[in-house]
Amino acid sequence: MTRDRPTLLARVLILPIRGYQRWISPLFPPVCRFYPSCSSYAVEALRVHGAGRGLWLTIRRLGKCHPFHPGGLDPVPPRRNESGTEISDARPGSDGEASPGAPGL
């Protein structure tokens, strides 16, 4: 679900997040109430959606990070095209299931 390569601005925004993940986050116990963690969510959102929408999704996610929110599974939404339908990078039959008409499966 990621773009072939994040935009330049998205890569610039990812750098400080990676720095936080590498040097600051290990100093503290894991306390994130979400999966994936907020920093991992931010990196994935920027890669999948680019700088504009990825930053917006990250800000929304950080806004939910408080003691009164239950947390839990909160994946990055899939990328959509101009008509609003999901863009899938998967090819038919690549999910491990046999495709219709596959002999012997």
Swiss-Prot record:
Location of region: Disordered: 68-105
Could you confirm whether the keyword Cell membrane appears in this record?
yes
> Magnesium as a keyword?
no
Pfam families according to UniProt? YidD (PF01809)
The record's comment on protein family reads: Belongs to the UPF0161 family.
Q: Any idea what job this protein has?
A: Could be involved in insertion of integral membrane proteins into the membrane.
PANTHER family per the UniProt record, alphabetical: MEMBRANE PROTEIN INSERTION EFFICIENCY FACTOR-RELATED
NCBIfam families in alphabetical order: membrane protein insertion efficiency factor YidD
Question: What is the protein's name according to its record?
Answer: Putative membrane protein insertion efficiency factor
Protein's organism: Thermobifida fusca (strain YX)
